[in-house]
């Protein structure tokens, strides 16, 4: 089974259980803690992915690291994942959980790239217009690309709306050449 499929199944099961048990906010908070630790500890991720580290040892490692920061329900999930030899997928499971949660809540990530940093007012106006355009809540991820000269490029899912001056000049150049 591919890692994406397995990750999505575990994430979906965790999301369903958290919703049914009415402890979704707790799980979301605890997953943020776990993700933060995993992002800052490459050795932990290697240990969880290593076939040389036995499942019981992985459970013990997870318990030692997270005993003061996650609840019993999350420990049950972590034990299950380790017991099923999927502890190495924890980063992917957490990412898939966030994707599923965002889909359920109607939130989308939007990459906004500009030549210079947008002001708070410009960002708010752009986010408002994008929310009206998509019908969803927008989570903006801002970036700066100095090669743009000016303008903004917006990436929503797989679609890019490029309103940068450099892109417009490139399109003008193509039309003049052909």
Curated annotation (Swiss-Prot):
Pfam families: OSCP
Membrane in keyword set: yes
MF terms (GO), sorted A to Z: proton-transporting ATP synthase activity, rotational mechanism
Subcellular location: Cell inner membrane
Keyword ATP-binding set for record: no
Keywords on record: ATP synthesis, Cell inner membrane, Cell membrane, CF(1), Hydrogen ion transport, Ion transport, Membrane, Transport
SUPFAM superfamilies, per the entry: N-terminal domain of the delta subunit of the F1F0-ATP synthase
Membrane topology: Peripheral membrane protein
InterPro entries: ATP_synth_OSCP/delta_N_sf, ATPase_OSCP/dsu
GO cellular component, one term: plasma membrane
Family: Belongs to the ATPase delta chain family.
Protein purpose: F(1)F(0) ATP synthase produces ATP from ADP in the presence of a proton or sodium gradient. F-type ATPases consist of two structural domains, F(1) containing the extramembraneous catalytic core and F(0) containing the membrane proton channel, linked together by a central stalk and a peripheral stalk. During catalysis, ATP synthesis in the catalytic domain of F(1) is coupled via a rotary mechanism of the central stalk subunits to proton translocation.
Subunit structure: F-type ATPases have 2 components, F(1) - the catalytic core - and F(0) - the membrane proton channel. F(1) has five subunits: alpha(3), beta(3), gamma(1), delta(1), epsilon(1). F(0) has three main subunits: a(1), b(2) and c(10-14). The alpha and beta chains form an alternating ring which encloses part of the gamma chain. F(1) is attached to F(0) by a central stalk formed by the gamma and epsilon chains, while a peripheral stalk is formed by the delta and b chains.
Name under which the protein is recorded: ATP synthase subunit delta
